[in-house]
Amino acid sequence: MNRTERFRRVALLMASFLRNLAYLRAFKDVHARIPMDWTRDFWITQGGNCTDIAVLEWCKLFADRADKHHWSRIVADLDAFKPSLLARLGMEEAAYSDYVTSVRRYRDKFVAHLDSDNVMDIPMLDIAERAVFFYHQHLTTQEVSDPLQVFRPLPSSSAELTLYFEHHCRAAAHTYNEVLPPLRTI
């Protein structure tokens, strides 16, 4: 696989992460409206699947150094990327490392395998989201000479990535609002 193909595959993982995060956030907004009937398991499973796929995709990009899509195997200037990432996230190295460990642990203990842990700590994905936006911006401004050619039809700029994410948030919210009954008040 050549470098251009690797950039494109990284962009595909980023898009998948953000789509699933958008669907998850829209799901959380309507969670209270899920009916207590035979469809409930479907909705709960759908929300959980979005979480799991988002975590899996993010781990490929940030948690597994051996993965061919991990930032350390893609970016040219390794010494500059991580400090810039940490600065963008507003985190120290230790806090970021703890966060990566928590996301990886959720993936390893509950998504990839069902280990014997009794408590499932589902990671918050706000930091993961900001990391993906940073990585995408880095690729489109520092690594890829022609992002439009490499990424199309995927977002090829930070502005396009933001629109892509917002579009999927709105699309999911619209879909949920169309199919779920309104919240009943007593």
List each language-model region with its residue ranges.
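Amphipathic alpha-helical interface segments
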Residues: 1-99, 122-186
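Histidine-centered, metal-coordinating catalytic motifs and their short helical/loop contexts
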Residues: 93-120
